[in-house]
Regions:
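Conserved ABC transporter NBD signature motif
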Residues: 67-78, 83
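The feature captures the beta-strand-to-loop junction immediately N-terminal to the Walker
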Residues: 44-46
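ABC transporter nucleotide-binding domain
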Residues: 178-270
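Helix-to-loop junction immediately C-terminal to a conserved catalytic motif
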Residues: 59
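Conserved ABC ATPase "signature" region
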Residues: 107, 111, 116-131
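Catalytic Walker B motif of ABC-type/P-loop ATPase nucleotide-binding domains
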Residues: 160-164
Length: 315
């Protein structure tokens, strides 16, 4: 099956910027990605990394300065109404008319499509009836997010772009949105979302592109990204017994050693095999008896922080 979205070597400049003597600023540096039907493809990165700009170029909302974008086989910039009808978009700020109420708005949006989605089902599923009589301007951020998601699905799209879909949601609404996204993926939709929340990316994604400062610095499935080279270890904490007169060694800043009770110590922050080797060597020299090792799997947040830190050092 062909990818629904293919981006190759995407470049984007903004400007001219008065603070930079009228120069242009490059914000996307050769981004390449693809998104498949029946998958959630996530652009993960900090605020300002270039995720939303990439999404805007992918939708054809802004022109690129280089590279190519193919959305359902077409160039999305200046796309035909036929292509637009196959794509749903949820913007980070909602983009909703403030004076309208949610349900009339959703029915109005659905009226533009030949194959509208199940608006009543979306209203029920996303709990929009709870605030149906309130104008958009008076809704909370999370309520606006739910309306924006329903609007993105109003045309029964094949591809859905979701920019920070869980922003402002309470835990219950967040779970409802996550469940809906998973069902849409299982139904064969291509879902492309952005997030700066590592937990969201880890829970939802089939494939992740990590974006940092306009560069695609890593990509893969969550399992691939969290898999480790042999130099890494998933130790989270170590507790051990020793003499109360133990002289503590100098440790790297990321390691935190404390005496919880006399003769009983806890070390937090062990990250690498080198950390663990230094620790075991010290135990051997001091005849220290380890008591317990607490292990945890690597998370996407660990991977993101390490990759971003390496990128910053490289720059």
């Amino acid at each position: 099956m062909s990818p629904s979205l293919v981006i190759e070597d995407l470049l984007k400049d903004f400007g001219p910027v008065p603070a930079l003597d009228g120069r242009m600023v490059r914000v996307l540096h050769g981004i390449s990605l693809k998104a498949e039907p029946g998958n959630v493809t996530t652009l993960l990165g900090a605020n300002g990394a270039g995720k939303s700009t990439t999404l805007a170029c992918a939708q054809g909302l802004v022109p690129a300065n280089g590279g190519t974008v193919r959305l359902l086989g077409e160039d999305p910039y200046g796309a035909s109404p036929a292509l637009r009808s196959r794509v749903g978009v949820m913007l980070q700020d909602g983009g909703l008319p403030p004076s309208m109420r949610p349900i009339p708005l959703l029915r109005h949006v659905a009226s533009f499509f030949q194959r509208p989605g199940d608006i009543d089902g979306l209203i029920e599923r996303l709990g929009i009836n709870e605030f149906a009589t309130t104008s958009i301007r008076r809704l909370s951020g999370g309520q606006k997010q739910r309306v924006a998601l329903a609007a993105a699905l109003a045309g029964n799209p094949e591809v859905v772009f979701l920019d920070e879909p869980s922003a402002g949601l309470d835990p219950q609404s967040r779970q409802v949105v996550f469940d809906l996204i998973n069902e849409l993926r299982d139904a064969g939709l291509c879902i492309v979302l952005t997030t700066h929340l590592m937990e969201d990316a880890q829970r939802l994604s089939d494939y992740v592109y990590i974006i940092n400062d306009g560069h695609n610095i890593a990509q893969g499935t969550v399992a691939e990204l969290t898999a480790h080279a042999a130099t890494e270890t998933p130790v989270q904490a170590v507790t051990f017994n020793a003499a109360t007169s133990l002289v503590l060694p100098a440790l790297p800043e990321h390691l935190h050693l404390a005496e919880s009770t006399p003769g009983h110590y806890r070390l937090d922050g062990v990250r690498t095999a080198a950390d663990l080797a230094a620790l075991t060597g010290w135990w051997s020299r001091e005849d220290i008896l380890p008591h317990a090792l607490t292990m945890q799997p690597r998370t996407l947040e660990d991977v993101f922080l390490e990759i971003a830190e390496k990128g910053n050092h490289a720059n």
